[in-house]
Amino acid sequence: MEDRGRETQMPVARYGGPFIMVRLFGQDGEANIQEQRLYELLSDPRSALGLDPGPLIAENLLLVALRGTNNDPRPQRQERARELALVGILLGNGEQGEHLGTESALEASGNNYVYAYGPDWMARPSTWSAEIQQFLRLLGATYVLRVEMGRQFGFEVHRSRPSFRQFQAINHLVLFDNALRKYDSGQVAAGFQRALLVAGPETADTRPDLRKLNEWVFGGRAAGGRQLADELKIVSALRDTYSGHLVLQPTETLDTWKVLSRDTRTAHSLEHGFIHAAGTIQANCPQLFMRRQHPGLFPFVSAIASSLGWYYQTATGPGADARAAARRQQAFQTRAAAECHAKSGVPVVAGFYRTINATLKGGEGLQPTMFNGELGAIKHQALDTVRYDYGHYLIMLGPFQPWSGLTAPPCPYAESSWAQAAVQTALELFSALYPAPCISGYARPPGPSAVIEHLGSLVPKGGLLLFLSHLPDDVKDGLGEMGPARATGPGMQQFVSSYFLNPACSNVFITVRQRGEKINGRTVLQALGRACDMAGCQHYVLGSTVPLGGLNFVNDLASPVSTAEMMDDFSPFFTVEFPPIQEEGARSPVPLDVDESMDISPSYELPWLSLESCLTSILSHPTVGSKEHLVRHTDRVSGGRVAQQPGVGPLDLPLADYAFVAHSQVWTRPGGAPPLPYRTWDRMTEKLLVSAKPGGENVKVSGTVITLGEQGYKVSLDLREGTRLAMAEALLNAAFAPILDPEDVLLTLHLHLDPRRADNSVVMEAMTAASDYARGLGVKLTFGSASCPETGSSASSFMTVVASVSAPGEFSGPLITPVLQKTGSLLIAVRCGDGKIQGGSLFEQLFSDVATTPRAPEALSLKNLFRAVQQLVKSGIVLSGHDISDGGLVTCLVEMALAGQRGVTITMPVASDYLPEMFAEHPGLVFEVEERSVGEVLQTLRSMNMYPAVLGRVGEQGPDQMFEVQHGPETVLRQSLRLLLGTWSSFASEQYECLRPDRINRSMHVSDYGYNEALAVSPLTGKNLSPRRLVTEPDPRCQVAVLCAPGTRGHESLLAAFTNAGCLCRRVFFREVRDNTFLDKYVGLAIGGVHGARDSALAGRATVALINRSPALRDAILKFLNRPDTFSVALGELGVQVLAGLGAVGSTDNPPAPGVEVNVQRSPLILAPNASGMFESRWLNISIPATTSSVMLRGLRGCVLPCWVQGSCLGLQFTNLGMPYVLQNAHQIACHFHSNGTDAWRFAMNYPRNPTEQGNIAGLCSRDGRHLALLCDPSLCTDFWQWEHIPPAFGHPTGCSPWTLMFQAAHLWSLRHGRPSE
C-alpha cells in the first residue's frame, strides 16, 4: 500500500478482479490502551527497550478496496467515488467537517517511525467489516469490495530505529500476538480475501466425547437407549408441560403484540404461554451460542433474559508480564461476550466469574469456559410442529459467517449480534404470519458444530437434496470462479466441503413442510420470506428432504432451479456422506482421586494469619471481588421486563442473589376488572394525574425468578458433593425471592464433564445423587445440557456443574436484596454446617496445601431453611438478606454492608474459634430484621430444628462508617466501608486497566457513581409522587407507531409505555411502509430499541440512509413529522440519530418536506463515543430544564430523576459548535446529565455520570416541542419496580414512577391538539 490517501492499483490475487485500495485517515485524539502501554515501555529510560521517542501520535486508518481501475469509463469512476464518499458519510463525514480524510498526521520520513496495523486482509473480513458491508449492500453499493478499520501510530526516534526486541514488544502488546497484522506499503498487492469464508478441517470434527456424554445423559447407543435425564427428572405433571427432559412452566400473562393486525381496536393481548430455561457450558464458547441453540429446542422461543458465567485459570506466570498477559486475555474475552449480549436486545440478569489456580485440581489445563443461560417465552400455539417427511424444504436463516478466532483477543471476529437479532425477529414474525404447525425439523448438535453436523441433526431418515445456486453468495461466487479444470464433481465437492460443510457457523437451520393451507393469503414459504424481509434477515432455501441418504448436490449454477421445482427428480452432481460416528475403544477413565485424610487444613492456625489479612486476600480474589467491569458494561434492562438485575443499592453494586423477569409490563386493573372506557381520558389533565391520591391498589407483578449456583472447584474435587453444593447455592440464592410456591422451584443442572475421566457409571451415580438430593429438597429437577472440554485438552481435569433455578414469582412491594435498610436492626445467620472450614473453600485454596473433600448439607435441613425464610419473607419481617457462599460468612456480611452503605458491628462469642467461623462456606443465609421481631424469628427457626445466631447490629449510613468484628472484648477487624469497597473492587480495577484508557482509570471522578438521592422534585413536592395508574381500553384516537428498524430488538418497553398511557400501539417495520399515506392514521411515532451492529454510530447513520433510500418510507415519515397534530419520541442511541438525521431535532429548522431527499451529511449532530470505550449500562441522574419546550416533559419540568442510560455512544457532538447555545435560548434542550446535587446548574461533566464527557446535553426537542429525542430511556423505568434503586424521597412506592407522566402527557396533548384518528 502507498501512503497519504493515494489510490494504488492492485493486481489480481485472491480477489478475482482488478481493484484499487484507498487509505483514509482520521485523527483519534489519543492512543488506545495498547498503544499507550507500548509507548510507556519504549519511552522508559530504565527499560532495555527504551528508544527515547518523541510525542506519540495516533490515528484511525480506514482501508477501502474498490472494484475496478483508474482506466474505467468516467461514469464508473464517478459511481465508485460516490460509494467511497458514502463509506465516509456512514463513518461520520459531514458537510461541515470530515472525520476521515486523505491527509495523515504522520509522516514516514526522516527519523519518524510509523506503524500501521489492523485485521488481516488475507483472512476473512472482521465482524465490523462484515456489518458495514451489509449496510452498503442494503444501500445498493456494488463497487466497495471490503472495508477495514485499522490503526496507525508513530513518533520521532532520537536514538536507533526499533530493533527485533522492540518489534517483539509491538507484536505482543499491539498485535495481540499476531491476532492483528502489520500493514506494510504494498502489502495488499498480493491480493486480499473478500468473502466471508473460512476453510474448515478436511473432515468435520464430530466430537466423539461430546456425543458420548450426551448419549449417557439423554439417551443413545452408548447408554443402551436409556435416557437418564428422563428417568431422574422430578416434575409435577399438573403444573408443568414437558417433553423428554425439557420442562416448560406455564404462564397466563405473556405480552403479545400483533403483527399486521386488521383489528383497529386492539394491538396487544395477554396470552397463555410457557417459560423455558436453557443453558450450556462450553470451552472457548461462541459469544451468542445459546441464542441459536435455544431454537433447537423450541423453534419459536423468544429470549427475554440471559445469564453469563466464566471459568478461567488464575492469572499466574513466571513474571509480571505473563500475569498481565493472562489478565488481558481474560478481560478481552469477557468483554467481547458482554458486548455481544449488550447489542442483542436481551438483558443479562445473572452471572458468575470463577478462577482456579493451575496448581489446584481442575485448574491445570483449564481452557476459558463460558456458561450461557437463557430464559425464553413461548406462546402456547408455537409448540406445535409437523411430522418430518420427505419433500420438505431446508432453510438456513442468517448470513453465512463461518467462525474464525471468535474468542482470540482483541476479538475482531466475535459474533454478530445483528445477525442473531435478525434471526430471532424473523422467527417471531414467521410464527405470527403463519400461526399453524409447519416446522418439521429444528434439532441442533449439543455443541459448536460444522454445517454438515447441523444438517445431519435435522435428518432422522434419508438425506437432503441441495442446489448449488441456492448456497450462500460467497460460496456460490467461489464456485463460479473455479476454472474449467477444477469445476468438476470432485473439485466442486472439495470446495463445498472446505468452505461450506466443514466450517462451523452461526446459522439456524430448519425444515418446513411444502404443502399447507394458505393463511392470510400466504403459503409457508411466502410467510417465511415475508418475515425475513421485514426483519432484515438473510435466508436461503437450500433444498429439500429426500429418501436418498447423504447430502446430494445438484449443479444448477448455469440454470438455477426455483424453489417450486426443488421437489422434482434430479440427479446429484456429487454426494457427500454424513460423517460417521467415531467409535472409540474401551479405556479406563482416570480415577477421580480425592484426599480425604483431613477435615481441616492446619494452615489457618499459623500465627501470621489474621482476619484482616485473610479478608483482604479473599475480597480481592476474582471469584469474590466486584464484577462491575462486566455488569455495568452489558445490557441489563432492555425490553423493560427486568424487575431485579445484578446491581443493587445506592451504589449499583453487582450483589443481587436473584433476578426477577416480569412476564408482562402492561397494566391491568386489580381483581381482573375490565379496563375503563377510553373516553375516560377526556376528563383527565396532567394535574389530575399527578395530584390524584393513590387508590390503595395492591399492584402485583408476576414473572420468573432466576438464580445460579456453581461450585466449579468443589465439583472437580468431588463430583457428587460438588453438584449438591451447586444445587444448594442456587436454591439459597432464591430464598429471599418472591416465589409463589416452593414446590414450583425448578432446578436445572448443566453438566460439564470429561468422559475420559468420568465413565458412564460415575456420571450416572452423580446424576442419581442429584435426583435424590432434589427430592429431599422438595423441588423439581431436570437436566438441561451436557458438555465436555475441547478435544485435545486432555491435560485438563476441570469439571463443573451449573445449577439454575427458575420459579414462578409475584410481588407487590419492595424486593428483598442484600441492601441493609435500617439503623439499629439486627443481623441473624442460619447455616447448615459445623463451622469448620469447608473443603474446597476459597480460604482453603489460598491458605492451605491440602485439598479436602467438600461436604454438602443434609437435604432436609436445607429444605427447612429455605421454606422457613420464604415464610418470613412473605410475612414482611425480613428487611434484607444475602446467601453465604464463596468467601464465607464474613464476605456475606461485608457485601451487605457495602450494598446498603451502612456500618455493621459483629460480635463473635469468646469461646468460638472465629477465623474458621468467619470463612466457612457452609450453605446458609444472613438476614436483617428489626429488633422487635427477633424473638418471633428465632422461635420460628428453632421450631424447625435450626439454630440461628444473632450476629450483630446495623449502624448508620455513609461511606465512612465502620465494619467491625469483635471477638469478646477484642476488636479483631475495624475498617471503613470506603476501604473495604476499594479492596472488593480491586479485581474490577485490574480488569479496567486492560479495558479503559489510563486517563479514565486515573481520573478522580471515576468512582463518582451512585447516590442518586438528592432529587429536585419541586414540581411534584406535596403531591403524590406516583402518578395515577389509569387503565383504559386502547384509545383509537391516539394511535402510536413504534418504528422497528432492521436488526433491532427491545421495542417492548416503548410499546408497553404507550399502551399503559392509553394509546393504541403497533409495531411498524420498514418494509411494511409502501406509500406515503401509511402513517396518516397515527398521531404518535416512537423510535428506539437496540441495534445489533457493533458500531452504534454507524448503525444510526446507516438507518437514516436506509430510510432515505425508500421514497415511500422517507416521505411517510417526513409527512408525519411536518403535520402539526403529531408528536414523536426517540429513545436511546439509535432513536436520537434517526430523529436528528431526519431533521426533527438538533437545529431550529423544520424537517424537510415530503419528496425532499434526506442528506445524511447534513445531520446537525453525531454521537460521541463513551470515554471508557466500552458499552455502558448506568443508572444516572437526568435533569429536565424548567423552560424546556417539550410537550411530553411538561409535567416533569425542573425535576432531577434517575433513569437507565445504555449504549456505546452516549454523548452529542454538534457539527455547529454554537448550536447548543442556540438550542438553549430556543428552549430546545430537553434534559441534561446531572450530578447528585439538586442545584439546577450542577450538570455532570465527568465520566461516569457523563458517559462521554462531551457536553452535558442528554436530550433535545423541536422548536414547537412536538418531537423529542433522549439518550436515556424512560420507557425502561415507568414503573418503580423497574428502578435500580428508589431514593428515600419516594418512600416505598409500588405504582408507576414520574416518568409515566411523559407518555400520559403525549396522549393528553394529542387529544387537545391532534386530529382525531378514530
UniProtKB/Swiss-Prot annotation:
One of its GO terms (biological process) is intracellular transport of virus. Coiled coil: none annotated. It comes from the Viruses. Keywords: Host nucleus, Host-virus interaction, Late protein, Virion, Virion tegument. InterPro entries: Class_I_gatase-like, Herpes_virus_tegument, PurM-like_C_dom, PurM-like_C_sf, PurM-like_N_sf, Tegument_herpes_virus_N. It is found in: Virion tegument; Host nucleus. One of its GO terms (molecular function) is phosphoribosylformylglycinamidine synthase activity. The keyword Disulfide bond does not apply. GO terms for cellular component: host cell; host cell nucleus; viral tegument. Tegument protein that plays a role in the inhibition of host intrinsic defenses to promote viral early gene activation. Interacts with host DAXX and thereby disrupts the complex between DAXX and ATRX. Suppresses the DAXX-ATRX dependent deposition of histone H3.3 on viral chromatin allowing viral transcription. Targets also host SMC5/6 for proteasomal degradation in a CUL7 and calpain-dependent manner to support nuclear membrane-less replication compartment formation and lytic virus replication. Belongs to the herpesviridae MTP family. PANTHER family: PHOSPHORIBOSYLFORMYLGLYCINAMIDINE SYNTHASE. Interacts with host DAXX; this interaction disrupts the chromatin remodeling complex ATRX:DAXX and thus allows viral transcription. Interacts with host SMC6; this interaction targets SMC5-SMC6 complex for proteasomal degradation. This is Major tegument protein.
